[in-house]
Amino acid sequence: QHTVVLDDLESPWDMAFLDNGTMFFTEKCNGLSVLMPEGEVNALLGMSGSEGYPSSEGDLFCEGQAGMMGVAIDPDFAENHRIYVYSTSNMSEPHTNRLMRLVVSDDFSSVSDRTDIVDDVPYKMEASDHPFGGPGAHNGGRVRVDPDGNLFLTTGDNHNEKLPQSPTLMGSKILRMDTDGNAAEGNTPPEGFDLRTYTYGHRNVQG
């Protein structure tokens, strides 16, 4: 037996909950929305090509396994109304994946104050000879908060054999950071590795 909470979604990707049941969720090719406890859905932030959002970020796009993915809630949300959203961006060449920090309005009708606290996670620009090997493949990426209030961010290997063991390229990793995107205290990566690195050598972490 099951209860349908929402339907007619397009590629729903992630959810994050407040204690009162408020649910932030992403649709990979549409954007960020929130389901309120009373059942009302507020669209918050769209991306290139999406419609029905009060604001959109034109650099955010969807291709293959890439798009708007992980979402997490700041441990001090009651005070700062911050959330974190991981999305693919064409703001730079080559394109990258970015972890954005956003501020939710008091009435949960909009977001503002975008700050990209991570902007250097690789994105697969071209197709390769792999199963499902098109652009955007093996792109990660989940965001979660640990008990100490730090952020975990998971990234994919882009079908690129150089990424898993690279000390400086942030694909194929789990990153652990504070809420400003800096390396979290207690990280112990091997010498020469980016200090945000928590674990490395992964295929396409999404859990």
Which role does the model predict for each range below?
Residues 1, 108-111, 180-191:
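Blade/loop signatures of beta-propeller domains
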Residues 1-162, 207:
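Acidic, Gly/Ser/Thr-rich repeat motifs that build Ca2+-stabilized beta-propeller blades
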Residues 64, 136, 167-170, 198-201:
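Short, conserved glycine- and acidic-residue-centered signature motifs
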Residues 97-107, 167-180:
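Beta-propeller blade signature
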Residues 115, 141, 172-173, 196:
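Extracytoplasmic/periplasmic beta-strand context in beta-sandwich domains
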Residues 144-151, 171, 176-185:
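A structural motif
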Residues 159, 189-195:
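Short, well-ordered junction/capping motifs at the entry into regular secondary structure
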Residues 194-207:
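Repeat-solenoid scaffold signature
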